[in-house]
């Protein structure tokens, strides 16, 4: 006998948690069930050690604003990401202010920086600063080529550096470090207190549509072969990170045809030595190597995890065919179907430089990888650093009318035409834009309910519907309010 519920959220990460809280705030009478394959929430991509945790706000990530062919830098994409991050930040602040999260310990003030180390990159960074400085959301950004000034911002990165090497840096004091694992756990604890049912160690075996439009999920207990649970729901969200593609394919919806996935793993060096970690307080992004994918931009990060400061450097791109860190090596081959084979072949052929880059990364020894860290931290001691494997990222491959198939970086909502099922595919900027992504998904899936949500959404997100960059006075008010509530 199937257990009936209004909403099923598959995946115990930041996306399901965010959507769950939004739905509970806007539709408190709806019954919600959250399913997670592992023994707890936030153990895959939302875990603090499996994501960059930058609070992506485009302050330091150079790949969001490349130099155009005309020599001009367009800040539009960076502004869009910054606006989205501020929507998330407002939502988190409201939940803290209303006592719905335990505290604000999931977010910390950590400056964001960009550091480049050759003349061409220094010239680019100056142009980027000039383009960004005129924008409200980036107005406090600083730029310098002065070695002493840069040393004040990031002393470890300048100590021992060649005096003749050109350097330039952007610095944004208002950057943050977000522990999405802690935030997810707090959100799910709140949901459990509101009656949301959580089912852990549950693997989705099958997804079927019934004649009345309901979705039926057959799940198995990963610890007990006899522990079957069947759920029947009128709305299904597939937010299982890299695992969402496999679930989307199981659903059989026509909108999911032609989608494929390309998994990329990431390695990082981690330093938990307090003496070193306390000397660096910034997230510092560099410029990506030629041919490197966007998720491989090198960065030396301050990370605050469970109240302790660490340093992380990476990522080093790798390849494993599983879609989740704790997934199966058969994930990629089993995801290849007749409807996505051609798009995947076309995308693979068009991205041979990326393939060569990944092969080169895979061949690197630990010593060769550490040499990259020395470019950013010249006096780094190998004994202080351990190499860890972060989470899997599954980049989207989709049909394209001209090219046959394209590899797409970013996130994408794939929903059934009637709004009864939605999946979130892709990766960066990911978690930092969870709130606007889930609000957009809700409007797409429940257009008839959206008008009744407007008032509460404006309470949850005080600047809802407003572009902060285009409303300077309102931006000052909202940014000051969220900074006070979140203690950043």
UniProtKB/Swiss-Prot annotation:
InterPro entries: FAD/NAD-bd_sf, MQO. It comes from the Bacteria. Keywords: FAD, Flavoprotein, Oxidoreductase, Tricarboxylic acid cycle. Its cofactor is FAD. Pathway: Carbohydrate metabolism; tricarboxylic acid cycle; oxaloacetate from (S)-malate (quinone route): step 1/1. Its EC number is 1.1.5.4. GO terms for molecular function: L-malate dehydrogenase (quinone) activity. GO terms for cellular component: cytoplasm. It catalyses: (S)-malate + a quinone = a quinol + oxaloacetate. One of its GO terms (biological process) is tricarboxylic acid cycle. It holds the Pfam family Mqo. Belongs to the MQO family. This is Probable malate:quinone oxidoreductase. It comes from Neisseria meningitidis serogroup B (strain ATCC BAA-335 / MC58). The lineage of its organism: Bacteria, Pseudomonadati, Pseudomonadota, Betaproteobacteria, Neisseriales. The gene is mqo.
């Amino acid at each position: 006998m199937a257990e009936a519920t209004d909403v099923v959220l598959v995946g115990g990460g930041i996306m399901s948690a965010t959507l769950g809280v939004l739905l509970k705030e806007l539709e408190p009478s709806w019954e919600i069930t959250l399913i997670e394959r592992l023994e707890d929430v936030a153990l895959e991509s939302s875990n603090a050690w499996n994501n960059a945790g930058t609070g992506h706000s485009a302050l330091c990530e150079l790949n969001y604003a490349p130099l155009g062919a005309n020599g001009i830098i367009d800040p539009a994409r960076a502004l869009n990401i910054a606006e989205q991050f501020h929507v998330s930040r407002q939502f988190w602040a409201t939940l803290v202010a209303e006592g719905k999260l335990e505290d604000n310990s999931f977010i910390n003030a950590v400056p964001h920086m960009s550091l480049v180390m050759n003349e061409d990159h220094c010239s680019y960074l100056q142009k980027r600063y000039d383009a960004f400085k005129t924008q409200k959301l980036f107005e406090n950004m600083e730029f310098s080529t002065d070695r002493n000034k840069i040393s004040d911002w990031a002393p470890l990165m300048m100590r021992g550096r060649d005096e003749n090497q050109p350097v330039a840096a952007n610095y944004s004091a208002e950057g943050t470090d977000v522990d999405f694992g802690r935030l997810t756990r707090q959100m799910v604890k709140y949901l459990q207190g509101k009656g949301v049912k959580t089912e852990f160690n549950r693997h989705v075996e099958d997804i079927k549509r019934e004649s009345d439009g309901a979705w039926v999920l057959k799940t198995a207990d990963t610890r007990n072969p006899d522990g079957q649970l069947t759920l029947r729901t009128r709305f299904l969200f597939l937010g299982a990170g890299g695992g969402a593609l496999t679930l989307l394919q199981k659903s059989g919806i026509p909108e999911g045809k032609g989608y494929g996935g390309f998994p990329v793993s990431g390695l990082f060096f981690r330093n938990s030595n307090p003496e070193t970690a306390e000397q660096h307080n910034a997230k510092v992004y560099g410029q990506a190597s030629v041919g490197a994918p966007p998720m491989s931009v090198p960065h030396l990060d301050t990370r605050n995890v469970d109240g302790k400061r660490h340093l992380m450097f990476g990522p080093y791109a790798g390849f494993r065919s599983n879609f989740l860190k704790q997934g199966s090596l058969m994930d990629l081959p089993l995801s290849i179907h007749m409807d996505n084979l051609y798009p995947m072949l076309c995308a693979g052929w068009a991205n041979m430089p990326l393939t060569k880059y990944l092969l080169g990364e895979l061949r690197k020894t630990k010593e060769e990888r550490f040499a990259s860290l020395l470019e950013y931290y010249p006096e780094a001691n190998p004994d202080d650093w351990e190499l860890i494997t972060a989470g899997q990222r599954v980049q989207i491959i989709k049909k394209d009318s001209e090219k046959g198939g394209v590899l797409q970086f970013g996130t994408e909502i794939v929903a059934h035409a009637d709004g009864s099922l939605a999946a979130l595919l892709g990766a960066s900027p990911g978690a930092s834009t969870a709130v606007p992504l889930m609000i957009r998904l809700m409007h797409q899936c429940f257009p008839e309910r959206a008008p009744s949500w407007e008032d509460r959404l404006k309470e949850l997100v005080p600047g809802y519907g407003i572009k902060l960059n285009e409303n300077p006075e309102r931006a000052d008010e909202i940014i000051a309010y969220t900074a006070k509530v979140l203690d950043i």
